[in-house]
């Protein structure tokens, strides 16, 4: 889609060197050099170009259907806040004909999520959009703070990632919504490709850059309108538009493996600014060679579309990942309770200690 540089009749531009002028309007001073193509743009042209690119991504990938009810995974952070603002803006401008709902998950992280949810509630008022909040405590009877106290901080992102993804699906299903959009940006996508390579997780490489994902048999699909949008530009857009967002990092994030991939990405980007898009495009072209089937194997393989035997959630295994994690948590909590039982006498404590020994 083509666009025309916005005019500014009120603030007439002062004379500046040609090399400092915006490459689009040729009248205002350039304030940004875009990392993906190194073009120099002024504030007004950058915002218009950024909005137009998101619209083009939505149209090119046919993300929305008229009359569709769409849930924005809202955390209060920069990505989801800009996403909510952008979808509201573009829906009004281009008449997508979609109904937008803010869907938030309260993981139960005191001093972080409670503050970010306050931002989401302000966004609800600012954008005039309905808001629904679901909590880990209600869905799983655990908060993230409780999980960390039992499982340790190094495992926090594993639990949070699994429970959060499932919570978004469960929340959307309860609201009768079949489409969830998330604020995953180009940096996130490139980091995911790198993480899968570093972990040797080839099974996920092929689908790690998909803009739309949906398990077979699932009524919920997910899409990422910011797939080609750099994080730097999302932050800059939020700054220029004076959007209200929460910028504090999660309490447990520093221990995440993603942080290692992020630091590596920053080093690469300093040498080659286009590396983020380059990695995404490489990921898009990755395909796994089909494996030969072994007729003698009698292992029953579960594919997407099967249901967890415990909770009924979609799972590629007999027991879903969330239920497996919950089982481990309950066992750990029981063990902690036994070890903290001060009512037991000395002999009983010694017996328990002996039972742990192997000979």
UniProtKB/Swiss-Prot annotation:
Stored SUPFAM superfamilies: Adenine nucleotide alpha hydrolases-like
Subcellular location: Cytoplasm; Mitochondrion
GO biological process, one term: tRNA wobble uridine modification
Chief localisation class: cytoplasm
Entry keyword annotation includes RNA-binding: yes
Record-linked PROSITE patterns: UPF0021 (PS01263)
PANTHER family: ATPASES OF THE PP SUPERFAMILY-RELATED (PTHR11807), CYTOPLASMIC TRNA 2-THIOLATION PROTEIN 1 (PTHR11807:SF12)
Protein name: Cytoplasmic tRNA 2-thiolation protein 1
Alphabetized GO MF terms: nucleotidyltransferase activity; tRNA binding
Listed EC numbers: 2.7.7.-
InterPro entries recorded: CTU1-like_ATP-bd, CTU1_C, Ncs6/Tuc1/Ctu1, Rossmann-like_a/b/a_fold, TilS/TtcA_N, tRNA_thiolation_TtcA_Ctu1, UPF0021_CS
Protein's job: Plays a central role in 2-thiolation of mcm(5)S(2)U at tRNA wobble positions of tRNA(Lys), tRNA(Glu) and tRNA(Gln). Directly binds tRNAs and probably acts by catalyzing adenylation of tRNAs, an intermediate required for 2-thiolation. It is unclear whether it acts as a sulfurtransferase that transfers sulfur from thiocarboxylated URM1 onto the uridine of tRNAs at wobble position. Prior mcm(5) tRNA modification by the elongator complex is required for 2-thiolation. May also be involved in protein urmylation.
């Amino acid at each position: 889609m083509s666009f025309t540089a916005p005019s500014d009749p009120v603030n007439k531009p002062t004379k500046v060197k040609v090399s400092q002028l915006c490459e689009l309007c040729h009248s205002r001073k350039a304030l940004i050099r875009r990392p993906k193509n190194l073009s120099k743009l002024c504030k007004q042209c950058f915002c218009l170009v950024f909005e137009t690119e998101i619209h083009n991504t939505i149209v090119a990938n046919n993300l929305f259907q008229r009359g569709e009810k769409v849930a924005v995974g809202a955390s209060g952070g920069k990505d989801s806040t800009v996403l909510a603002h952008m979808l509201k803006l573009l829906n009004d401008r281009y008449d997508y004909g979609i109904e937008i709902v803010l869907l938030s998950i309260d993981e139960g992280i005191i001093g972080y999520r409670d503050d970010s949810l306050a931002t989401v509630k302000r966004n609800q008022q600012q954008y005039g959009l309905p808001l629904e909040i679901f909590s880990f405590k209600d869905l799983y009877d655990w908060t993230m703070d409780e999980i960390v106290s039992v499982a340790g901080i190094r495992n926090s992102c594993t639990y949070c990632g699994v429970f959060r993804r499932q919570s978004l699906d469960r929340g959307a299903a309860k609201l009768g919504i079949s489409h969830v959009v998330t604020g995953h940006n180009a940096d996130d996508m490139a980091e995911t490709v790198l993480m899968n390579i570093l972990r040797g997780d080839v099974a996920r490489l092929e689908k790690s850059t998909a803009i739309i994902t949906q398990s077979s048999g699932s009524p919920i699909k997910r899409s990422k309108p910011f797939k080609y949008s750099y994080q730097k530009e999302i932050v800059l857009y939020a700054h220029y538009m004076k959007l209200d967002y929460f910028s504090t990092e999660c309490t447990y994030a520093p221990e995440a493996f993603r942080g290692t991939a992020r630091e590596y990405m920053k080093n690469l980007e300093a040498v080659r600014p286009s590396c983020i898009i380059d990695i995404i495009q490489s990921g898009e072209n990755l395909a796994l060679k089909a494996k030969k089937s072994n007729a003698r194997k009698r292992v029953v393989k579960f594919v997407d579309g099967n249901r967890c035997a415990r909770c009924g959630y979609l799972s590629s295994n007999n027991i879903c990942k969330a239920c497996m994690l919950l089982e481990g948590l309950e066992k750990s909590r029981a063990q902690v309770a036994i070890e903290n039982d001060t009512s037991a006498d000395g002999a009983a404590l010694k017996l328990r200690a002996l039972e742990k020994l192997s000979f």
